[in-house]
Amino acid sequence: MANVIVIGAQWGDEGKGKITDLLSRSADVVVRSQGGVNAGHTVVVQGQTFKLHLIPSGILYPDTECIIGSGTVIDPSVLLEEMEQLHALNVSTENLFISQTAHITMPYHRLIDRASEERRGKYKLGTTGRGIGPTYADKSERTGIRVVDLMNGDDLQEKIEWTINYKNAILEKLYNLSPLDPKQVIDEYRGYAEQLRSYVIDSSLKIYEAIQQKKNILFEGAQGTLLDLDHGTYPYVTSSNPIAGGACVGAGIGPTVIDRVIGVAKAYTTRVGEGPFPTELNGEIGELLCDRGAEFGTTTGRRRRCGWFDAVIGRYAVRINGIDCLAITKLDVLDELDEIEVCVAYELDGQICDHFPSDANQFARCQPIYRTLPGWKQSTTNCRSLEDLPKQALDYLKFLAEVMEVSIAIVSLGASRDQTIIVEDPIHGPKRALLDENGVPVSKADTQE
């Protein structure tokens, strides 16, 4: 039995969907613990592409139970659309479960999200406009509507009427927008309730029972560490906690049941939206990374900003999450480069800085200090073991493991499941593996007398 968290070690879009899909074949349960439709993950199976926002990647395995947890925010229209798309591809959703305590994204959340972003002007955050922030704001303000409310028809009408009257005042007076019709919204969401009712459960209890039965549970993170509300590049962050600790809170479990944390990072770095990005490349190499990596958001379609691998934020992610091993994705995107840079530290106001500064103004002033490594100038997409990799590619991976101070368990060389190298058992491998002088993972137990 193993309970494993998969989280993003950068700014999201690291390829968690593929890694979770790979690991789901060994999982009995997959849990999505936070975020909403602002997160997208893509899985490619036998040439067929699945783009999901709310439903866990494990849905492609019919014997794997998939839970949308309490810490998520759910847009019912998007969820039902995803379910219909899966049905059209002959994928069952009978193994899907929805937490009764997850919060619901309402029409006024989307309207306020977009209007608020437009009103910010030069201070815009780069929100997806899907209503995620306002939904979480209502959750904190204790005025939100939860799945359990949606299922309670008697109270739903009164609650929606009161909330819409309150939100209409904001829409009209602050944003000069037309008010919403409470009856229309009530009818719409009652329809969603009937379609989703059979999927709704006490998710924390179900997860607890799976733990008691010693099942393998995979907790699937959305977004990435640097987008965490408390520990990311605030204010250019999401409205939830996509770190390992947030997975426990969002799933409704204690941290002591977690056996392993797997961090996912690209072989370079990307970011969507606004905010500082020390290793960003605006020239030809940045364009090459974007084009070869197909760096366009699953949710918004926006072009992602691309840059060199940043080991400073990588080490920060390892520390914040207690990462035991890494999955490095999109190594193949670097195949055509003569040289590859890795940021190992920053220069901040004339001083060497080897840690991530929490002050956004300081972070914006950080200049990357690079280590240059040779490229390999040949395709890696058909490599299926470390021995198949060009020496320079293997040296690059060893260097990343060294500067990140954690071992690499998985290397991804393309979107398909089979374009993967398993270096060590990512589920049952050693806790926080160390490296010997040859870059080979060894457990802490092996290093103790």
From Swiss-Prot:
It comes from the Bacteria. Binds 1 Mg(2+) ion per subunit. Keywords: Cytoplasm, GTP-binding, Ligase, Magnesium, Metal-binding, Nucleotide-binding, Purine biosynthesis. CDD domains: AdSS (cd03108). Its main location: cytoplasm. The active site is at 13 (proton acceptor), 41 (proton donor). Pathway: Purine metabolism; AMP biosynthesis via de novo pathway; AMP from IMP: step 1/2. GTP binds at residues 12-18, 40-42, 304, 330-332, 412-414. Signal peptide: none annotated. Its EC number is 6.3.4.4. The keyword Kinase does not apply. It is found in: Cytoplasm. Substrate binds at residues 298-304. GO terms for molecular function: adenylosuccinate synthase activity; GTP binding; magnesium ion binding. It holds the Pfam family Adenylsucc_synt. Homodimer. This is Adenylosuccinate synthetase. It comes from Gloeothece citriformis (strain PCC 7424). The gene is purA.
